[in-house]
Regions:
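Mobile, glycine-rich extracellular loop/lid and propeptide segments
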Residues: 1, 51, 56-57, 68
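Conserved short alpha-helix immediately C-terminal to the canonical SAM/SAH-binding motif I
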Residues: 5-9, 37, 59
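A structured beta-alpha segment of the ubiquitous adenosine-cofactor-binding alpha/beta core
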Residues: 19-53
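Loop/turn elements at helix/coil->beta-strand transitions in domains of secreted/extracellular proteins
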Residues: 27-29, 46-51, 69-73, 99-103, ...
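Beta-strand-loop-alpha-helix segment that lines the small-molecule cofactor/substrate pocket
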Residues: 57, 61-112
Length: 159
């Protein structure tokens, strides 16, 4: 594990340990702090291991590049980039990961939704004509959880 801030590193470890104490094995000597902490965290992994990049996207490409150099498979959260030059850099790094036979995945929650895939296919097949502008909005209310407390009877759902 790695972070720039001690309190965030501690909180991440605490949250992971709380939910799955038997599955979390990150002793203090494998929790790294600082701007180069990502390198220290990857240095303790072996080629073929998996690294999770859940950092702000501005830092994604140097971390991805280092993971490729170390022969690590990568799971990264979206967004992957924030601008054109960085996007081109990520495409180049993606090609390098393919050359090294590394697996790379991105946390795109809608990518595997059958209804959205069908919508994509219909748009691509021209069912709504030529597109000059497309805006999409994801409208959702509060997300439920198995761990959510029940709403008090005197509380409105429209807060």
């Amino acid at each position: 594990m790695a972070d720039v801030f001690q309190d965030k590193l501690d909180k991440s470890y605490e949250d992971l340990s709380k939910g799955n104490p038997d599955q979390v094995d990150v002793p203090a000597d494998r929790r790294f702090l600082g701007f180069d902490a990502y390198k220290k965290a990857m240095d303790v992994l072996s080629p073929g291991d998996i690294v999770v990049l859940a950092t702000p996207p501005a830092f994604r490409w140097p971390m991805f590049q280092y993971a490729i150099e170390k022969g690590l498979n990568v799971f990264m959260e979206k967004p992957v980039t924030v601008d054109g030059p960085t996007s081109r850099k990520m495409f180049e790094l993606g090609e390098k990961s393919v050359e090294k036979n590394l697996k790379v995945a991105v946390g795109l929650m809608c990518r595997h939704c059958d209804a959205r895939q069908e919508l994509h296919d219909r748009i691509k097949n021209g069912e709504i004509g030529d597109i000059t502008l497309l805006r999409a909005y994801r409208v959702a209310g509060p997300t439920g959880s198995a761990f959510a407390e029940p709403k008090p009877d005197d509380e409105s759902e429209l807060l």
